[in-house]
């Protein structure tokens, strides 16, 4: 398990609204312990998951977001 930004298949972070419950819900659906909206982070407002299973893709800093 690890922590990280959940991403779309294009390696773009899933954006969110700070303090909304959406990220916690999305992260838990993917098997994480919890999650929250990381506001004003390096990738904008993105969903950060805690204790996410290794099989779930997270933001790869070595790859660009391809929209």
Swiss-Prot record:
Propeptide residues?
Answer: 67
Q: Which Gene3D superfamilies match?
A: Knottin, scorpion toxin-like
Q: Name one GO biological process term.
A: defense response
As one GO molecular function, the record gives: sodium channel inhibitor activity
SMART domains annotated for this entry? Knot1 (SM00505)
Q: Which domain of life is it from?
A: Eukaryota
What does the sequence similarity comment in the record state about its family?
Belongs to the long (4 C-C) scorpion toxin superfamily. Sodium channel inhibitor family. Alpha subfamily.
Q: What does this protein do?
A: Alpha toxins bind voltage-independently at site-3 of sodium channels (Nav) and inhibit the inactivation of the activated channels, thereby blocking neuronal transmission.
Q: What is this protein called?
A: Putative sodium channel alpha-toxin Acra7
